Amino acid sequence: MTSPIVTRFAPSPTGFLHIGGARTALFNWLYARGRCGKMLLRIEDTDRERSTTAAIDAILDGLKWLELDWDGEVIYQYSRAARHREVAEQLLASGMAYRCYATAEELAAMREKARAEGRTRLYDGMWRDRDPKDAPGDVKPTIRLRAPLTGETVIEDQVQGRVVWQNENLDDLVLLRGDGNPTYMLAVVVDDHDMGVTHVIRGDDHLINAARQKQIYDALGWTVPSMSHIPLIHGPDGSKLSKRHGALGVDAYRAMGYLPSALRNYLVRLGWSHGDQEIFSTEEMIKAFDLPAIGRSAARFDFAKLENLNGHYIRHSDDAALVRQFEDVLNYVPNGATLKAKLNDATRAQLTQAMPSLKERAKTLLELIDGAAFLFADRPLPIDAKAAALLTPDSRALIGRLHDALAAVEPWSGPATEAALRAFAETNNLKLGAVAQPLRAALTGRTTSPGIFDVLAILGRDESLGRLKDQTTS
């Protein structure tokens, strides 16, 4: 019987949940969910100076927004420091670790000498076999792993393949600092072991850590989890991802109007492929995702592709669900509170009614908000430059006549106003476009909007006639 799959997402709370971290969380989540396993969440807060509560909150909020749930309670690494120290002492007792009394000055000299000689092994092992009786009384020792000096450390990585390090190039790494605090390397191994993690899926910037951590596993006689080191995300030109290219927090993507479903779909295709398929439902992702299908080369972030994908998701979203997304994003955009204050049962109903037309033109929720601005505008309506150019004196006179024609429509509806406008155009020997364009400018303050008959129906009689009256000349 095989043991259940357990993955983990283990961010450090020193900043926001960046896009690379979000993809790592997604890959862990998909792998676990597709195999009836668990994904655990561990906050690696051992760096007390840089870890912040605000960063922890941002990570949790980002995961919740992406709808990536975890199993069990959040584990905080620092709270397990006593257990980490216990394991360090265990290694010390077994002879697989030793106390090192090297001073900061001695260590600096070792590093300088090693670099001058072109060696990657920086620590010279001065306390590896030295009698502890020689220990200076004024130095608080670290505990170092007694790493093998010869042979190889090998990882069979599910993404990178077989990766080999020569042990002569790897240091006796520090497990416990002089102040008694465990290092990241030790804490990760102990936590993964104690939590039953079977699969470690993380960025390939951690690949060198895998070698060091395997040596700790071997020293303890513990089973090494399956390792998968996924390629990093680069900018579209292949350079390191920058803020200009998309190296932003998940919260920034929410504020830019991206849907969590679209961002998940985009992220899963950054480095992973399943034939030529580009669009995946969550269920399809869970079913199809596997580690060997992840490529080794860096994925390239493309804002235009994300935007187009987001537009697809907006167009195919349920209208009521989009209204909820619309309202939610107002909490994260400038002047969102002003617009949110105008949302009530009546305006929500108008927004829902307009959504089939609005969503066809929008690639982000911000574009959706912009397209819906005419619904929430106060009278007299602000008119943009392009619309103002249409509202010539002749057009305003025409609007006055249109006002009178529409005032006679009863009952008010899209089909009824359409019939009235077509009759007006025919009677006055005008093309419908010559009527619709100034009418749109007067009703929405823009030159683009949902269909003009839809606009009239959504605004209703009183608001439509009032806006036309505002733009009429005597």
UniProtKB/Swiss-Prot annotation:
Residues engaged in binding ATP: 243
Motif ('KMSKS' region): 240-244
Keywords from the named record: Aminoacyl-tRNA synthetase, ATP-binding, Cytoplasm, Ligase, Nucleotide-binding, Protein biosynthesis
Superkingdom field: Bacteria
Compartments it resides in: Cytoplasm
Motif segment ('HIGH' region): 11-21
Subunit relationships: Monomer.
PANTHER family the UniProt entry points to: GLUTAMATE--TRNA LIGASE, GLUTAMATE--TRNA LIGASE, MITOCHONDRIAL-RELATED
Described function: Catalyzes the attachment of glutamate to tRNA(Glu) in a two-step reaction: glutamate is first activated by ATP to form Glu-AMP and then transferred to the acceptor end of tRNA(Glu).
Family assignment from sequence similarity: Belongs to the class-I aminoacyl-tRNA synthetase family. Glutamate--tRNA ligase type 1 subfamily.
Descriptive protein name: Glutamate--tRNA ligase
Species for this entry: Bradyrhizobium sp. (strain BTAi1 / ATCC BAA-1182)
Lineage: Bacteria, Pseudomonadati, Pseudomonadota, Alphaproteobacteria, Hyphomicrobiales
